[in-house]
Amino acid sequence: MIKAIVTDIEGTTSDIRFVHSVLFPYARERLADTVRQHGSDPEIAQALDALRQELSQPDADSETLIAALNQFMDEDRKSTALKLLQGIIWRAGYRNGDFQGHLYPEVAAQLAAWQQQGLRLYVYSSGSVEAQQLLFGYSNAGDLRPLFSDYFDTRVGAKRETDSYRTIAQAIGLPAEQLLFLSDIRQELDAAQEAGWHTCQLIRDDADSVSRHRQVARFDQIDLPEYAQ
């Protein structure tokens, strides 16, 4: 019997194009000015110090850091410092009303229904916990943060590594057979399944004929009693 559901974001609750066409360009346009004009602000200074450590350049100046950040974005590198700075910029954008977090139309109602049924809800995404909370807190369906019990990012491990799901199960405090992971990526679901989890693949766009996981097109097509069999 499923007692908790852990969901991915990109391609699962939300259109991946929102991240790549809205969030990433918004941060890129403002990153250099943020470093130059606000580099002494405590939160930003901490992120820049983390970047210097990543680069092994403790004395790197602002322009060197900006060049590195632009390179990281070009390479889609999973840099902790870059994620911190992007999160700071996105926070301002959400609060200013420059954009709202995108959710597919059925997601909010289904999440609320599951919570009302007594299920615990969690998020596991490659985006930082703060970025996750911003997306759900300023979503096009309102503030959904009260629906979630907790959030996980890659600090627990990469999403294609089986041990990451063991770590999350331990943090949640439930056995793997009572957990359901939702994602659009087959390899992530493979890792969760290897850890003993139930899985469901969201097919929002292109079909995945290789996958062996249960597949649905929408959250409201997920039939939880099937997982009790």
Swiss-Prot record:
CDD domains: HAD_EP (cd01629)
Keyword annotations from UniProtKB, A to Z: Amino-acid biosynthesis, Hydrolase, Magnesium, Metal-binding, Methionine biosynthesis
Catalysed reactions, semicolon-separated: 5-methylsulfanyl-2,3-dioxopentyl phosphate + H2O = 1,2-dihydroxy-5-(methylsulfanyl)pent-1-en-3-one + phosphate
EC numbers, comma separated: 3.1.3.77
Cofactor note: Binds 1 Mg(2+) ion per subunit.
A Gene Ontology molecular function term of the record: 2,3-diketo-5-methylthiopentyl-1-phosphate enolase activity
Enzyme class: hydrolase
Disulfide-linked positions: none
GO biological process: L-methionine salvage from methylthioadenosine
Cofactor(s) required, per the database record: Mg(2+)
Keyword Ligase: no
Pathway(s) of this molecule: Amino-acid biosynthesis; L-methionine biosynthesis via salvage pathway; L-methionine from S-methyl-5-thio-alpha-D-ribose 1-phosphate: step 3/6; Amino-acid biosynthesis; L-methionine biosynthesis via salvage pathway; L-methionine from S-methyl-5-thio-alpha-D-ribose 1-phosphate: step 4/6
Record's function text: Bifunctional enzyme that catalyzes the enolization of 2,3-diketo-5-methylthiopentyl-1-phosphate (DK-MTP-1-P) into the intermediate 2-hydroxy-3-keto-5-methylthiopentenyl-1-phosphate (HK-MTPenyl-1-P), which is then dephosphorylated to form the acireductone 1,2-dihydroxy-3-keto-5-methylthiopentene (DHK-MTPene).
Family that this chain belongs to: Belongs to the HAD-like hydrolase superfamily. MasA/MtnC family.
Assembly information from the UniProt record: Monomer.
Protein name: Enolase-phosphatase E1
Organism from which the protein derives: Pectobacterium carotovorum subsp. carotovorum (strain PC1)
Taxonomic classification: Bacteria, Pseudomonadati, Pseudomonadota, Gammaproteobacteria, Enterobacterales
Gene name of the record: mtnC
